[in-house]
Amino acid sequence: MSVAWLTQQLSTHGIELSDKQQQQFQTYYQMLVEWNEKMNLTSITEEHEVYLKHFYDSIATSFYTDLTKELTICDVGAGAGFPSIPLKIIFPNLKVTIVDSLNKRIHFLNQLAEALELDNVSFVHDRAETYGKGDYRASYDIVTARAVARLSVLSELCLPLVKKGGHFIALKSSKGEEELEEARFGIGVLGGKVLDTISYELPEDAGERQMIIIDKRSQTPKKYPRKPGTPNKSPLLEK
């Protein structure tokens, strides 16, 4: 069973799954597949691939950053809940907010959180550009995003939400370093500084991943993020 595989893999990183956590991942998989028949949540539906490329890949974030404290996390464009819901299952201490622009996905996540009996999770139907202008601007310890957009775009969506001294963690494929070179200028404009770039391989030759950790050094200028759609059309690039 794939949950046994996940349990064994995480054990090598010092994470021991309880019976409850194993059941939560099984429920997560079942609901993901059921809801995916009604709406587009993921192109990956084979059980072992979901455990490897969604669950394990999400949790791998914790191998390189300390998530054991009581932290506030905002996950931008999480889709079916990755990486924040697998991380919340492992680290119940996290206070998680997911922002997604599609109301159907928010409905799925609400049902999922109820089925998994998760507390301190909230789901917001909004564009990141709008959410980053509101009351929760500069209020999160960590803001994360996985496979949402290029880093030059993501930085403008995510860094305004990070509190000073917090981190924006971008989870990318093997092309993350290429994206980083393009995004460095905008990261600086938005008050960030690249702290680390970590490359690692998924098990079973499932591919390389890169985790880019950006420190929030100063407050983001008030004009950012720009209106919805603008960061994607005109990313902050050095001229």
Swiss-Prot record:
GO terms for molecular function: rRNA (guanine-N7-)-methyltransferase activity. Keywords: Cytoplasm, Methyltransferase, rRNA processing, S-adenosyl-L-methionine, Transferase. GO terms for cellular component: cytosol. Its EC number is 2.1.1.-. The keyword Cell cycle does not apply. The keyword Methyltransferase applies. Residues 215-239 are annotated as: Disordered. It is found in: Cytoplasm. Its main location: cytoplasm. Pfam families: GidB. InterPro entries: rRNA_ssu_MeTfrase_G, SAM-dependent_MTases_sf. S-adenosyl-L-methionine binds at residues 77, 82, 128-129, 146. HAMAP family: 16SrRNA_methyltr_G (MF_00074). PANTHER family: S-ADENOSYL-L-METHIONINE-DEPENDENT METHYLTRANSFERASES SUPERFAMILY PROTEIN (PTHR31760:SF0). Specifically methylates the N7 position of guanine in position 535 of 16S rRNA. Belongs to the methyltransferase superfamily. RNA methyltransferase RsmG family. NCBIfam families: rsmG_gidB. This is Ribosomal RNA small subunit methyltransferase G. It comes from Staphylococcus saprophyticus subsp. saprophyticus (strain ATCC 15305 / DSM 20229 / NCIMB 8711 / NCTC 7292 / S-41). The gene is rsmG.
